[in-house]
Amino acid sequence: MISFSSFYQQIADSNLQHWLETLPSILGKWQRDHKHGNLPKWEKVLNKLHYPAPDQVDFVDSVTVGSGEQLSPGEKEKLENLLRLFMPWRKGPFHIHGIHIDTEWRSDWKWDRVKQHISPLNNRTVLDVGCGSGYHMWRMLGAGAKRVVGIDPSPLFLCQFEAVKRLAGAHHPVHLLPLGIEELPPLDAFDTVFSMGVLYHRRSPIDHLLQLRDQLRTGGELVLETLVIDGDENAVLVPQDRYGKMNNVWFIPSVAALMLWLKKCDFTDIRCVDTDVTALAEQRRTDWMPNESLLEYLDPTDITKTIEGYPAPKRATIIAIKNQPNQETVNG
C-alpha cells in the first residue's frame, strides 16, 4: 500500500503542521475507497520496481533518472514493460534509465513558457493543483523549491508519480496526495501555488480562485494557466455540450475577464505573461498514449476550430499575488 507517512513526518515541524489534524483521515478514507479496482493491481507493479539508485538525475532541464548505463538490456526491457502497465502516460516526457516515456503532452514546452515569468522558486514551498503524474513538480524541484506538494485525485496519476519517485529516490521532497482542492482546509502556507489546466474543468471558477487564494500566504504567488478565448472582460464561452470532445469544460473566459475575476478575488499585481495556441505537436497520440488526442478533437477541415465549432484551444498564463483580503470578501 502506498504510504504517506514520510510526508506527515516532514510537515510535522513546518507551517503545514495544522494540516495533520485532518489529512491522515482524509487519505485513509481515499485508500479504503480504492481498495478495489485498479489501484491494488498498480501497487503490485510498484512493488516490483526494485532497481539501484540512479547514477544521475536531472530535474533542471528535463526529468531524467539514470544515465541508461546501469541496467542490462534485459533489465531495461523488464523495466519498460512494467512502466507500460501504467499507460496511458499523459504528462511528461520522462527519461528513466534510458527509456523515453513519450507522453501525450509535451509538458516541458509549457514549463519553458512559464518558468521565465515566475518568482524564483528557491527555498519556496510549492503547491501544484491538478498535478497529473507530477512532471511539473519535478521541474519545480529542479528550479530550487524546498518542498513541492501536488494534489490530484486520480489513482493512475498517483501510481505513475510513485513509479518515478521510487526510481529517482524516495528522499526527494516531492509528494503527490490523491486529493481535490475542495478537500484542503485553508492552509495560508504556500509561497507559490500553480493551477495549470484546471480552471475550465471547475463548475464554479470563482470558487476555484478563492480556494487557490486560501492556500497561499499573504504575498504568495499564483501561477494560473488555463484555456481562454478572445474578447473583452465580458467574454466567456460556456460550451453547450462538449468542448474538444470533453464533457467537463464549463467556463472559458477571455484574458480580460479572467483578470477581472482575479481582482474580484483580492489578487493584486495581476498580469498575463503568455498566450499560446496549443500546437498539434504539443498534444498528440504516442506509443505511450495510443488513444485519441488533439488532432481528433479539432475540425478536420479547419484546425482553428474544435470538432464542435468552438475556437481551438488557446492557453494563457496569468500571474497574481495574494493580497490581504478585504472584510467584505471574507464575510461574503
Curated annotation (Swiss-Prot):
Presence of the UniProt keyword Metal-binding in the record: no
Single GO term (MF): methyltransferase activity
Subunit structure: Homotetramer.
Family: Belongs to the class I-like SAM-binding methyltransferase superfamily. CmoB family.
Reactions that this protein is recorded to catalyse: carboxy-S-adenosyl-L-methionine + 5-hydroxyuridine(34) in tRNA = 5-carboxymethoxyuridine(34) in tRNA + S-adenosyl-L-homocysteine + H(+)
Domain of life from the UniProt record: Bacteria
InterPro entries: CmoB (IPR010017), Mo5U34_MeTrfas-like (IPR027555), SAM-dependent_MTases_sf (IPR029063)
The protein's role, per its UniProt record: Catalyzes carboxymethyl transfer from carboxy-S-adenosyl-L-methionine (Cx-SAM) to 5-hydroxyuridine (ho5U) to form 5-carboxymethoxyuridine (cmo5U) at position 34 in tRNAs.
HAMAP family per UniProt: tRNA_carboxymethyltr_CmoB
Keywords for this protein: Transferase, tRNA processing
Source organism per UniProt: Shewanella sp. (strain W3-18-1)
Positions annotated to bind carboxy-S-adenosyl-L-methionine: 91, 105, 110, 130, 152-154, 181-182, 196, 200, 315
A GO BP annotation: tRNA wobble uridine modification
Name of the protein: tRNA U34 carboxymethyltransferase
Gene: cmoB
Entry EC number(s): 2.5.1.-
